[in-house]
Amino acid sequence: MFKALFGVLQKIGRALMLPVAILPAAGILLAIGNAMQNKDMIQVLHFLSNDNVQLVAGVMESAGQIVFDNLPLLFAVGVAIGLANGDGVAGIAAIIGYLVMNVSMSAVLLANGTIPSDSVERAKFFTENHPAYVNMLGIPTLATGVFGGIIVGVLAALLFNRFYTIELPQYLGFFAGKRFVPIVTSISALILGLIMLVIWPPIQHGLNAFSTGLVEANPTLAAFIFGVIERSLIPFGLHHIFYSPFWYEFFSYKSAAGEIIRGDQRIFMAQIKDGVQLTAGTFMTGKYPFMMFGLPAAALAIYHEAKPQNKKLVAGIMGSAALTSFLTGITEPLEFSFLFVAPVLFAIHCLFAGLSFMVMQLLNVKIGMTFSGGLIDYFLFGILPNRTAWWLVIPVGLGLAVIYYFGFRFAIRKFNLKTPGREDAAEETAAPGKTGEAGDLPYEILQAMGDQENIKHLDACITRLRVTVNDQKKVDKDRLKQLGASGVLEVGNNIQAIFGPRSDGLKTQMQDIIAGRKPRPEPKTSAQEEVGQQVEEVIAEPLQNEIGEEVFVSPITGEIHPITDVPDQVFSGKMMGDGFAILPSEGIVVSPVRGKILNVFPTKHAIGLQSDGGREILIHFGIDTVSLKGEGFTSFVSEGDRVEPGQKLLEVDLDAVKPNVPSLMTPIVFTNLAEGETVSIKASGSVNREQEDIVKIEK
């Protein structure tokens, strides 16, 4: 039960990172634009008073503010895309769903008189104190905030994952597959809006009561508890879920424009813009002292406690991790260096983090952030606005550094903790990050994860690879650490490997390898051993010379579709080349061209051809049909055979194959189009086997 819940929470946590990743850019625009309009700043830098400079400053501030004003919509889109493995259709569905949900709530609220229908009265209504309602994207509606966006995003993703391969009757074929998702999402969002009218008001009332009581009862204790829990969740990657309500939904503030703003971070940005006294930032400011000073001091303590022969190695590891923490506030590379080998140190660190939040609250210092508590955000939201006692972070940080340094050194010696550089000789194997070649790292990580076949789901956030594997026993955690992971967390079949800011790039490289788009720089194995390598062999160098008109016929009878309708991103994203797809109504596949057979996959589900004119074509029958290992497929050609248009290549038992694969949609891909060439579909609806003029290659 816990493992399943952890997997779900992990997915939601990484999905939240997509909209959150937008905020630093918006925050920079807002902070700099506001600072350029600050009266104290203008007195020092007189050129800022120029009308043109002030115009630019106003534009920058507005450009940043619009992002924070529309966070619910951004969360709806970001969460949907994140939970749908990056597919943009889910994002479109989320936009439609969010608009429909709000319009449906608005219609009811206007009809029953809760919100005035008269525009003048409605404008007055929103300038008064009605925090339960908001004018979102011009729609007078219930104030569901970021939670409303997240709910719609989850709904859109669930519907996408359920229906993106749906097949409808032929007369409704245009609306099949991914096109069906926005339709079903809009209907579901209409129902969701009506449900939210009933369930959300008491939920909102409870959230308001909780957040108000939390601050009024004992804000200092609340800040301490927040800091401890937020750090404690770092190993599980669930801290995003914990802090999101505090940053984006709890608490409220009425802006100068009369708008009700919710969430510690959003309120801080609004108060910066309004030029009022800062009251927000309690649940952000505490990060600066321990991220900029405390953890780097902990790194120094670990270095000083390392064995003399290991100090040079530890200096490199700890130095880079400490610098990363100081500049950017990314702390995982440093935290995970001692989390698993010395959990007691991490427990101490969590308490110190809570202490940092508590002290900054007692001093009433308010500094917001968009990314994390490093020097960059400290300058943008503390020093540049100059609206709070930002300088107090430095003495508090230095004091915390002393506590971290001596606290860590005492604990390491007292409990003989095996922090980096203090391992027993038997444990001191390869140095972290040492691999044969830099370009081999993603391959080595895949092997340490149990190879490609063991990867069920692959994703990443800012600091860690998040992998769901089929068999966790095949994962070599020690090897992952040797490859540079500062920590590896395992909960059931969910693996998190902490590679720091490189994680997202490594994920992309690993996805390329899994998709067969980046051949390993070493001798290839037999083509019979790996289907993925055979796909690579089909992808040739682009054509350099123009090809005259060739006879090209439909290889299958069925319904023709653009290749973007294929429910597989390798094909729909045109990663192997442009083309088209056919949803078969019968199981016979014929040659579309005159030429030769380049490749017949061992599983018989795909064939590569080359026309006499040099065009190379891949016919891939169905999606994930490789898993059938040839069952239901009969091949009538072999590699090197000459073929004519209409000659039989394959016969497929549709009744046997269809129930066992996600879709029968068959992509036909031109894998070596010249630069600038694209495939356009001339036919529509159903096409017959051997039918000519169904597609055209254009420049």
UniProtKB/Swiss-Prot annotation:
Localization annotation: Cell membrane
Transmembrane parts of this sequence: 16-36, 66-86, 89-109, 139-159, 180-200, 233-253, 283-303, 313-333, 338-358, 365-385, 388-408
Membrane topology: Multi-pass membrane protein
Record function comment: The phosphoenolpyruvate-dependent sugar phosphotransferase system (sugar PTS), a major carbohydrate active transport system, catalyzes the phosphorylation of incoming sugar substrates concomitantly with their translocation across the cell membrane. This system is involved in glucose transport. The system can also transport glucosamine. In addition, plays an important role in the phosphorylation of EIIA-deficient PTS transporters. The EIIA domain can transfer a phosphoryl group to EIIA-deficient PTS transporters, enabling growth with maltose, N-acetylglucosamine, sucrose or trehalose as the sole carbon source.
Null allele phenotype: Deletion of the gene reduces the growth rate on glucose but has no significant effect on growth on glucosamine. The gamP-ptsG double mutant grows slower on glucosamine. Deletion of the gene negatively influences the growth of the cells with maltose, N-acetylglucosamine, sucrose and trehalose.
Gene Ontology terms, MF aspect: D-glucose transmembrane transporter activity; kinase activity; protein-N(PI)-phosphohistidine-sugar phosphotransferase activity; protein-phosphocysteine-sugar phosphotransferase activity
PTS EIIB type-1 domain span: 439-520
GO biological process: D-glucose transmembrane transport; phosphoenolpyruvate-dependent sugar phosphotransferase system
Active site: 461, 620
Ranges in a coiled coil: none
UniProt organism field: Bacillus subtilis (strain 168)
GO cellular component, one term: plasma membrane
EC number of the protein: 2.7.1.199
Gene name in the database record: ptsG
Annotated PTS EIIC type-1 domain residues: 3-424
Domains: entry comment: The EIIC domain type-1 forms the PTS system translocation channel and contains the specific substrate-binding site.
Name the UniProt record assigns to this protein: PTS system glucose-specific EIICBA component
One Pfam family here: PTS_EIIC
Entry's induction text: Strongly induced by growth on glucose and glucosamine.
Catalysed transformations (reactions): N(pros)-phospho-L-histidyl-[protein] + D-glucose(out) = D-glucose 6-phosphate(in) + L-histidyl-[protein]; D-glucosamine(out) + N(pros)-phospho-L-histidyl-[protein] = D-glucosamine 6-phosphate(in) + L-histidyl-[protein]
Keywords from the named record: Cell membrane, Kinase, Membrane, Phosphotransferase system, Sugar transport, Transferase, Transmembrane, Transmembrane helix, Transport
Domain PTS EIIA type-1: 568-672
